[in-house]
Amino acid sequence: MSINHEIYYILVFEHRSVAIKLIIVVIVLLQFFLARSRQIDRTWAHTNRKERFREMTAIGNTDDALDTSTAASKENGKGRLRVQKACELCKKRKVKCDGNNPCLNCSKHQKECRYDFKATNRKRRRRQVASAVRDVSKTYAETSESFPRDLLSKSNIIINAPSDGVSSSASNSPNPNSHYHHISSTLPFMSGRPNHTFHSGSNLNGENNNNSFPEDHMAKLLLQLSSKLGNTTKESSIRTTRTNASDVNANPTVVNMKNSQEDCDTNHRSAICDSAEALHNNNINSKENKIINSQITNTVNDHFESPWQTFSLDKYRFHRRYQNILPYYLGVSILKDLSPQTIEYAKLKRPRVQNYGWNLSGGHYLKYKGDFRSQEKNIRHESKFFDFDDPVHLSLINKLLRYYFDEINPVFSIIHEATFWQQYNNKFLRQGKQNNSSANLFTSMLYLILSTTLRFREGHLDGQKGQGTYSNTSLNITFEEKSILIKKPSIEENLFKYAYLIINTLTFEWESFELIQSWLLITFYFRTCYRQTACWNALSQAVNMCNGMSLYLNKFPEIHSTYDESKAWHCFWCCFIMDKLISFQMGRFYQLSLPASEMCEQMNLVKSKKFLQEEDDWFHEETFQMLDLSIIVTQFLKRDAQDLNLNETVQLRSQLGQWYDTFIVGSQTNAYDDNYRYFYQVQPFMTYLDIRLTFEVRQLFCLIAPSSTANNKSLEYVVDTELLISHCQMAIENLAEITRSNLFFVPWWLNLSQLFTVNLICIIYLHAGIAVTQNKAIMQSCQEIWRTLECSKPKNRPSMLPECLWCLKMLNHMFCIRLRDSALQLEATLGTDHGDDTPNRNKFEQFKKVGDNDADVEVDAGEREENADERQENPHNNSKRVPLATRSHNTTNFDGSIAISPESAVANLGTDTGLPSDVLDTVSKIGNSPNVFDDDLFSNLLWFDQNFA
């Protein structure tokens, strides 16, 4: 109890001293701001006089002003003339000035009358302000040394002393109160109030706001500051009470982690509530309170800027994916440890920051010549591509469409298959040759589907049948159908260019669900085989159209059909999924926010119908899996270049683990025979692995030198090596299965990027010596896939494949050189001539010294085998050992000359004590037993004499 009272008195004394020092700081600050307010009032008084002088000059001419001033002087008689400001000529001549413009003296001498309003003699007042600032700085320095740092850190309050430079610059700035922005920025709960920043100029109505004084503003700041410190003081006392109540004898500085987390949450909640009460006292309505509370919550959750996320070297492209940034920082870290001669000799180059393995594009690209409109002369009608009256052409189109809806569309469900086939069979064949907007739009969507399917078809290796578990729907194109494609080698690009021209033209002045679907098809095509900027721009078109049509409100015009509601709902969620996942894979922040709560509830209802009643025939099961992943990404993707804190990391792992348990069936990741039969079905699982690896690879930055701009809190991370390695094993087993099925070059874009990420992780772990056995096996599987890809001959060889291999081999080369140099340095300095293991051998056992030649020394294995037969023949003789009396430490000496063995001592024990006869018989039997002392039981009695305290 005395310890608790002492701790309580210490805390009370500390809080009282803190309160006294805080009051001193408040008084000094109030004095300073009162002085500043007087200076501001005088500045505004001079400004008003200047405006009055200009008005007088504009209203009357010089003669009128002269007459007026003369009359005024006559009325005043000999009274002393006092003015606030003299003109330059009067000051130079050192004569009285009447303060008019022009003044009387300048009018008499016909000189130009000029006033200098900037030159104001305020030396005395400036000295007062400077002294006040010095007092504040001195008090701040004394307070900062003695102020409890834990209270300031827990309350997120930073007290900055105003400097002379701030005070002097404030008077010359357009806004004299601009230095108050700095004070408000130091208080986290002030960042959300726009009306905290006041101005001395005019208000919204154009009137001068002379009623806003700095001391009023400072009073509000100090009110909230005191409430914030009060909450921290209460929290500190409560925490101390809980700790002492739980364990009186425990160290008061050691707090249970669970209790500290609960106290931290309580502190956050109480701070938010008290801040809301302080703001309510300032006449802020409930809506503003909600906004400010949310901003306070975001501020309390310490988010620090990431020291790793960065731009590309020569482009305004910000990267948030850690696997794209990690090679750059690794290269910089290793090159610092190598000599310039070694770098030049080995031709080492630092890997650049880029999106490694963006897609599997290659072979042929879109050739952008100025504008697609320039090619309109060569593309006038769709009849140049296919003849829909020809049965061979029609059969080829049907096979391509069937492949798209079976192998590509189920992942994102951009197109409603049932509606498309209905329009294709009923409307398109009848209106295909008509020149109207509806027919052109549907034709464009058809051509986008065909161009995407042709690109996927080229990813299959001709004449090679896969041996893996994944299968893919074969087109089974006949020779006549294949000859049509051979005669038109650039048909894919021409189909896309025609569709892009029509859609871009219609988007110029129209909005519709079909245009949203068209832009999503263009986004998918660009994600497959073109650049990131083109993909982002196409995705932005779809997002802007969703926002422009307000699909997120889940509201409809008065005249609409039931199917319009379905189209609006599905188009929005499809755009939402692609926006979140493609933006995440691109390393950019998403553009489309979550919709109204009604749409989320409806989404859950549709999901239940999808899995239970099969009522939704638009979205597939894979689409709902991608939807759940996109919602997870929305919660944890940071816009302002921030890393996840500890709590967010744990929440992310929990939600991803729930997704894995829900949708991925089976404990073995390579048993896809029952779950994954087609290649498209594994895309949600690969997206899950991509999200996992992207966030978990951040822990590898701990193995390299931290950045100079790194904050201590930004380096805090829950490292889980086993989790990262297990997901690397899942990814590499899945990629190996894809490679065995000869489907690696089918342009699903995560194939190459995931292989690069897993291989990069293994290289870093092997260099650091972490989980060497597991990473060796994963590394071996990666090398087998790389060799297979290098030996393969696809029609469109990925252009980013050499980039990924070069980066991995360059980093591996750097690692090998640094390890070799380190090994040579260690061998040269410390040496490796360690000799045999004699110094490493144990010299003492539990209760004796190793190597004693006594009865307890065990014979080695060879002697046991040689004497085994002898012990069996003479068991009685073999049981005899050297008597314990021969040991000096077991011998009891009397009179310094007679040595009595333990046997005789036990035998004579009963005769001296007068024990009964039956007891004496038992004692004699024990004394005559040859096994009692041979087992060396009494030698262990020395163990009880040891001090284990």
Curated annotation (Swiss-Prot):
<comment type="function">
    <text>Binds to SIN3.</text>
</comment>
<keyword id="KW-0479">Metal-binding</keyword>
<dbReference type="GO" id="GO:0005739">
    <property type="term" value="C:mitochondrion"/>
</dbReference>
<dbReference type="GO" id="GO:0000981">
    <property type="term" value="F:DNA-binding transcription factor activity, RNA polymerase II-specific"/>
</dbReference>
<dbReference type="InterPro" id="IPR036864">
    <property type="entry name" value="Zn2-C6_fun-type_DNA-bd_sf"/>
</dbReference>
<dbReference type="GO" id="GO:0006351">
    <property type="term" value="P:DNA-templated transcription"/>
</dbReference>
<feature type="compositionally biased region" description="Basic and acidic residues">
    <location>
        <begin position="862"/>
        <end position="874"/>
    </location>
</feature>
<keyword id="KW-0804">Transcription</keyword>
<dbReference type="GO" id="GO:0005634">
    <property type="term" value="C:nucleus"/>
</dbReference>
<feature type="DNA-binding region" description="Zn(2)-C6 fungal-type">
    <location>
        <begin position="87"/>
        <end position="113"/>
    </location>
</feature>
<dbReference type="InterPro" id="IPR051615">
    <property type="entry name" value="Transcr_Regulatory_Elem"/>
</dbReference>
<dbReference type="GO" id="GO:0008270">
    <property type="term" value="F:zinc ion binding"/>
</dbReference>
<dbReference type="Pfam" id="PF04082">
    <property type="entry name" value="Fungal_trans"/>
</dbReference>
<keyword id="KW-0539">Nucleus</keyword>
<dbReference type="GO" id="GO:0043565">
    <property type="term" value="F:sequence-specific DNA binding"/>
</dbReference>
<dbReference type="InterPro" id="IPR001138">
    <property type="entry name" value="Zn2Cys6_DnaBD"/>
</dbReference>
<feature type="compositionally biased region" description="Low complexity">
    <location>
        <begin position="200"/>
        <end position="212"/>
    </location>
</feature>
<keyword id="KW-0238">DNA-binding</keyword>
<dbReference type="GO" id="GO:0003677">
    <property type="term" value="F:DNA binding"/>
</dbReference>
<dbReference type="Pfam" id="PF00172">
    <property type="entry name" value="Zn_clus"/>
</dbReference>
<dbReference type="InterPro" id="IPR007219">
    <property type="entry name" value="Transcription_factor_dom_fun"/>
</dbReference>
<protein>
    <recommendedName>
        <fullName>Probable transcriptional regulatory protein STB4</fullName>
    </recommendedName>
</protein>
<feature type="region of interest" description="Disordered">
    <location>
        <begin position="164"/>
        <end position="214"/>
    </location>
</feature>
<keyword id="KW-0805">Transcription regulation</keyword>
<keyword id="KW-0862">Zinc</keyword>
<feature type="compositionally biased region" description="Low complexity">
    <location>
        <begin position="164"/>
        <end position="178"/>
    </location>
</feature>
<feature type="region of interest" description="Disordered">
    <location>
        <begin position="862"/>
        <end position="888"/>
    </location>
</feature>
